[in-house]
A protein has these predicted regions:
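Glycine-rich FAD pyrophosphate-binding loop
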Residues: 17, 31-57
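A conserved short coil-to-beta-strand element within the FAD-binding core of flavoproteins
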Residues: 122-137
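N-terminal FAD cofactor-binding segment of flavoenzymes
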Residues: 31, 53-91
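Active-site substrate-recognition segment that forms the wall
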Residues: 187-240, 246, 250-260
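Central helical "cap/lid" subdomain
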Residues: 49, 145-201, 261
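Core beta-strand elements of the Rossmann-like FAD/NAD(P) dinucleotide-binding domain
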Residues: 12-14, 141-150
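Beta1/beta-strand and adjacent pyrophosphate-binding region of the FAD-binding site
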Residues: 10-24
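Short beta-strand to alpha-helix junction loop
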Residues: 68-75, 89, 93-115, 238-250
Length: 264
């Protein structure tokens, strides 16, 4: 989105503001910076990466967001190759026909690499995007504004629709029309995982979209036994409002049935 041009000469703070420091925002920031634009990324979280994420708890490590990354453009292929050369990513041959890229030693290493050298403001939440005379203002929850000639918003569509609603209703309506497939994920720290499958488990007939023994991932730093289970989109949509305890119990049962292995 770009601001209208008139005779006002208020200079913007940046050529480009990017809302969101997930993979899309980081990739856009790298390309804009390479093209010579002054750029700033703003993210409400304390870490970059968005859904390419890793969580640590009591020595356990869980890659609980996107499980791997694929590249479909030359630019992103080049970025992942650079991350691999730097030791922050590596290949994973999921099957003979599917080779993907994962973070090393964890998934969040990839966005960490992509963020290197980019100006990013973390823990700052934008409340709305406002059209000004000669720029666009991104106004945060404290009422402070950052100004730019152009803005890229990579936030999830429902959040984007809210940010755009006051001054960009047509764009807001487009964003609001997007639909999402939910994914209920559980993370289990175990006493022993050596008996669990060492390859990803896909069992849609048992409502399991993905399950992985974290210590069996290649390029991994996890040493404590841990299991991440992600439900299918259909099951997740039907059970999104279940309590945590209910979801955990049901997904453990489904995993045990699908894998033939006991968890615990």
């Amino acid at each position: 989105m770009s601001a209208a041009t008139n005779t006002t000469t208020t200079p913007p703070d940046y050529d480009l503001l990017i809302i969101g420091a997930g993979i899309a925002g980081l990739a856009a920031g790298r390309m804009a910076q390479r093209a010579g634009y002054s750029v700033m990324l703003i993210d409400k979280g304390r870490r970059v990466g968005g859904r390419v994420s890793t969580r640590r708890s009591d020595g356990f490590m869980f890659n609980h967001g996107a499980q791997y990354i694929t590249a479909r453009t030359d630019e992103f292929t080049e970025a992942l190759a650079a991350a691999t050369s730097a030791g922050m990513a590596g290949n994973w041959q999921l099957d003979p026909a599917k080779n993907v890229v994962i973070g090393a030693p964890m998934m969040r290493a990839i966005p960490g690499f992509l963020a290197d050298g980019l100006p990013i403001q973390q823990n700052r939440r934008i409340a709305r995007i406002s059209r000004q005379a000669d720029h666009i203002a991104c106004i945060d929850t404290e009422g402070d504004a950052l100004r730019a000639g152009q803005v890229i918003c990579t936030a999830p569509a429902p959040q984007t629709a809210t940010l755009l609603a006051s001054d960009f209703p047509a764009l807001a309506a487009t964003a609001a029309s997007a639909t999402y497939a939910p994914c209920v994920t559980i993370m289990l720290g175990l006493a022993d995982d050596s008996h669990l499958p060492a390859t990803p488990l896909h069992a849609p007939q048992h409502d399991i979209g993905w399950a992985m023994r974290e210590t069996a991932r290649p390029h991994v730093a996890s040493t404590r036994p841990a299991l991440t289970i992600q439900a299918s989109a259909e099951w997740s949509a039907a059970h999104i409002n279940d309590t945590d305890d209910t979801s955990i119990a049901q997904l453990i049962d489904k995993y045990q049935l699908a894998s033939g292995c006991s968890v615990g």
